[in-house]
Each structure stands twice: as C-alpha cells, then as structure tokens.
Amino acid sequence: MIKTKIMGILNVTPDSFSDGGQYHSVDQAVKRAKEMIDEGVDIIDVGGVSTRPGHKEVSHKEVSLKEEMNRVLPVVESIVKYDVQISVDTFRSEVAEACLKLGVSMINDQWAGLFDSNMFNVVSQYGAEIVLMHNGDGHRDKPVVEEMLVSLLAQANKAELAGIPHNKIWLDPGIGFAKTREEENEVMARLDELVATEYPVLLATSRKRYIKEMMNQDSSPSDRDEATAATTAYGIMKGVRGVRVHNVLLNTRLAQSMDFLKENEYERHHLS
C-alpha cells in the first residue's frame, strides 16, 4: 500500500503567519519535533524564513543568510539524530549545504531553484530529495495551470540534469503563492494534471488564506485544521504523495484512512 507522507511544519521564526515565535528557541523546537514524531510524522520541515502572506520575494532581503543559518542550524543539529526524515525549507544553497552536511535529506525550495541556481548541484552532491514549489510575481502570459506545469517541469528537468533522480524531485503547486483565489481553485481542481507528470506531488494548504476563504468565515489559523484535513483527503484522492501540515495527528489519522480506502478500492477493481 502506498503511504501518503505527512510533512510536519516546524517554523523557527518569530513571524510566521500561523505559529511565528512559538518554536523560536531550540528547546521549544525540539519539544515540538518530539511531539510530531509521537503523532506519526514522516518528515519534519524546518523553516527559518517566514513565508507569511506579503513576504514573497522580499524574504531574502529581510532575513540575512547569517540570520537564517543562526535560526535553522542549531535546531537541525538537535533533531537530526531522531529516527525521522528532516527537511529544510530554504531557497539558499548555502543554508541547504550546511544542513545537508548535518544529515538533512530533503530541501524544500519555495522558489524551485529560481532564486539560487546552485541549489540543484548542492542537493545532487548529497543525494538528497528536493521539493520544487511553484511561485512567481503573479503575472503570467498563459493560464495558471499551464504556466505552473511549464515552470515546474522546466525546473525539474534542470534538477535531473544536475543529477537528482526523478523519484527524488517533488512538485508543490504553491497554493497561497502568487495566485488569485480563482487561480487556486483551478489548480486544486486540476491537481491530477500535476500528478500525471509522475513526479511525487506535495500539497501544502495548511491553515492558509485559501482554507479561510474555503470556510467562508473569519477564523484564526489554528481554527482551520479540519478544513485543511478536507484538502488532505481531496489531495490523496487526486493522487498526491505527501501533505505539508501544522496539525500532524489529525492529518496522519486521516491519511491512514484514506490510504486504506484507496487501496481497498484498487484491489476490488482489479480482482481477477
């Protein structure tokens, strides 16, 4: 049975939109990492630069390379010994390499290698996995899904040319980044087209504005977990291979059930 991977979010920033400052100290971050492991997480994604609404392309100007290193490296060094895969959410190859040297095995690049052209070489050198997220400035000359596919496949091709195997390249449609609400609806409705590329797909909707608008009511980020879980179920039915979430326990339980139901359906449709 194919298992949907649960990527738990561990923001070690003072200003992330959902949990900024909550895990800013190493001790707090380690405690949360242990909780996520107990809850069944497959991958812990450590991020040192906020991607809250409005940050987009200015993040690298507001947080220096040195500051990002100071936030991320002590946490990574403290949790990489645990029996769980560690990912680092960064668009800087210097941060990626420093973390890969410590034993990290995945880099989650919100700019898909467009910000730092050396990212693919670094990830390839360490035999790691990479997540390529669709991003941009919101201006496009073709419909959103077509533009997303062209952009992500171009970057995935560069990653493969750098020596990263196909099965270690994840694609993330970038819900919450450089898209209107209608464009996000279009991307969600056509997730199967991204899945059809045969790269593993990671869906990251957790607690985002998209969830708030889907609920059609004012809500704090932590009140959006059940609706986030609905997108997890939907994504699994569409064929995504992983989800990036804040509430690990809820999504782990849901994913286990969805995986069982999908496997059950497959087996019964393929009985000889």
Swiss-Prot record:
Stretches assigned to the Pterin-binding domain: 1-251
Pathway of action: Cofactor biosynthesis; tetrahydrofolate biosynthesis; 7,8-dihydrofolate from 2-amino-4-hydroxy-6-hydroxymethyl-7,8-dihydropteridine diphosphate and 4-aminobenzoate: step 1/2
GO MF terms, alphabetically ordered: dihydropteroate synthase activity; metal ion binding
PROSITE patterns: DHPS_1 (PS00792), DHPS_2 (PS00793), PTERIN_BINDING (PS50972)
One GO-annotated biological process of the protein: folic acid biosynthetic process
Binding-site positions, Mg(2+): 11
Keywords for the protein's UniProt record, in alphabetical order: Folate biosynthesis, Magnesium, Metal-binding, Transferase
Cofactors: Mg(2+)
EC number(s) given by UniProt: 2.5.1.15
Entries under Pfam families matching the protein: Pterin_bind
Cellular component GO terms, alphabetical: cytosol
Keyword Metal-binding: yes
Residues passing through the membrane, by range: none
Binding site for (7,8-dihydropterin-6-yl)methyl diphosphate: 51, 89, 108, 172, 208, 244-246
Chemical reaction(s) catalysed: (7,8-dihydropterin-6-yl)methyl diphosphate + 4-aminobenzoate = 7,8-dihydropteroate + diphosphate
Presence of keyword Transmembrane helix: no
Complex and partners: Homodimer.
Reported function: Catalyzes the condensation of para-aminobenzoate (pABA) with 6-hydroxymethyl-7,8-dihydropterin diphosphate (DHPt-PP) to form 7,8-dihydropteroate (H2Pte), the immediate precursor of folate derivatives.
Family, as annotated: Belongs to the DHPS family.
Protein name: Dihydropteroate synthase
